[in-house]
Amino acid sequence: MGSQEVLMDATKLASYSVILQILFRVLTFALNAFTLRYVSKEIIGIVNVRLTLFYTTVVFLAREAFRRACLSHSAQQSWRHTIHLTWLAVPLGICWSFILGWIWLQILEVPEPEAIPYYNIGVWAFGFSAVVELLAEPFWVLAQAHLFVKLKVVAESLAIIIRCSVTVILVLLCPQWGLLIFSLAQVLYTSALALCYIAYFARFLGSLEAEKKPFPLRRMREFLPRFSSSQAFLDWKQAWLAWSFFKQSFLKQILTEGERYVMTFLNVLSFGDQGVYDIVNNLGSLVARFIFLPIEESFYVFFAKVLERGKKVQSQRKEEISMASEVLESLLKLVTLIGLVIIAFGYAYSHLALDIYGGSMLSGGSGPVLLRCYCLYVLLLAINGVTECFTFASMGKEDVDRYNYVMLGLSLSFLCLSYYMTLWLGSVGFILANCFNMGLRITHSLLYIMRYYKGSPYQPLIGLLPSPVVVCVLAVSAAVTGYSEVALCCDKGWLLCLGHIVVGGLCLLVTLGAAVLSEKKLTHFIRSHLLSRHQRKEQ
């Protein structure tokens, strides 16, 4: 498959993933807004922070390293060895479920049974759901590697709809069940997800479509691990790469979910405050989840397939390295512009957004300040996602091992900084600590990219510099919307609040127009690779 075809499939995957993330977040926010009226914020804190952290930790530590190693491009790649490697995620997930389950029940603070019953059942249910999801890992890796873009969207959409439907029905009919509702919904979610992948490949293999595609498997039983006396069970080069990523996964998980670990292990916030923080945090991460994460996941596949891992620029094929440089520059430009727009408009609309979503419980106190700080974090999160996407896709094993030490230092500094800044500033301290560490991670990735392209004519990092016209328009928009908030929002009635929204909409249109007119190269990239598929369909 040529680099152009890989790029088209990767952009298609990103588009579908954005749709999936929008569906997921819209349903999640609607569900949170609904459940806030029927269950306590303490239960929301337990589910969204404590139990979800348990589940994501098990899943991440069990599969992340295998995913990165198995999706890396190699001319000698054997899919039999790859499948064997992905199956190791299941026993690893079982081990982590028992180890972390014991910690969650015996070491951490346990809520009072009278206030929040069924906590023990909730812990084991979320651990079981993680193992169920890992059963679909071989199918997920094959689907992702061969860019089955619609499968992921359909599977996760159905699973999300099932979870939300079960939660709403049980909250209405049996609100006294508390954590049992969310535990059952979580198990059904991962079960539906795994069954969708298995059912799809059961139908796909043996069909005419499978015969036409260069798919490496022909029967379902080939997904199962097989021992052979004439062939090694694993590709040890691939296994050692996975081991390097596995060591790194501990540190990356701490950096990704650091504030939740601090909340969970150090008890700096009550369960109720954790619930409020999580809701505000989710609202602040809307764009990150809608756009940035799908871009990172999809274009990691692109970079991993186009670039030879561990090789210098001079050793790469010219067409591939040129394409990778162009894509990296355009992605950096895109996410930087989106992040700057969020900063410019986020300050003036944070209070209104929280007031609409959760009322005075969220818009009062530190909620608006927290969301405004999160706008800066979103910009850093966007840039880091793209730079690390390229970095991890091009690093060799030795580079990954060296980066593990960097991650160790970042993890330790982040935990210490989060703890002390939270004691000093409350929940806002979490966001500021995240900003500091994200800045350090970006700096490391930028230095790596500069070394990677040193001695070549390519300069993809200029994508971090928006045009002066766009910067000026953003500054004016921030000033206008800031004045609009003071004059029209948020305690002056809904009619004036609507006027504040109209002012922001007009400023946003002007900003988008300035970006389209001044960022010609980015506009061409979006039209060529993100919109061309829809244009071909219309023709």
Curated annotation (Swiss-Prot):
Cellular localization per UniProt: Endoplasmic reticulum membrane
Keywords: Endoplasmic reticulum, Membrane, Sugar transport, Transmembrane, Transmembrane helix, Transport
Pathway annotation from the record: Protein modification; protein glycosylation
One CC-aspect GO term: endoplasmic reticulum membrane
Keyword Transmembrane among record annotations: yes
Transmembrane segments: 16-36, 42-62, 85-105, 121-141, 168-188, 189-207, 283-303, 334-354, 376-396, 412-432, 433-449, 460-480, 494-514
InterPro entries recorded: RFT1 (IPR007594)
Pfam family, one: Rft-1
Topology class, membrane: Multi-pass membrane protein
Cysteines engaged in disulfide bonds, as pairs: none
Keyword Transport: yes
GO biological process per UniProt: dolichol-linked oligosaccharide biosynthetic process; glycolipid translocation; protein N-linked glycosylation
Task of the protein: Intramembrane glycolipid transporter that operates in the biosynthetic pathway of dolichol-linked oligosaccharides, the glycan precursors employed in protein asparagine (N)-glycosylation. The sequential addition of sugars to dolichol pyrophosphate produces dolichol-linked oligosaccharides containing fourteen sugars, including two GlcNAcs, nine mannoses and three glucoses. Once assembled, the oligosaccharide is transferred from the lipid to nascent proteins by oligosaccharyltransferases.
Family, as annotated: Belongs to the RFT1 family.
Descriptive protein name: Man(5)GlcNAc(2)-PP-dolichol translocation protein RFT1
Organism this protein belongs to: Xenopus tropicalis (Western clawed frog)
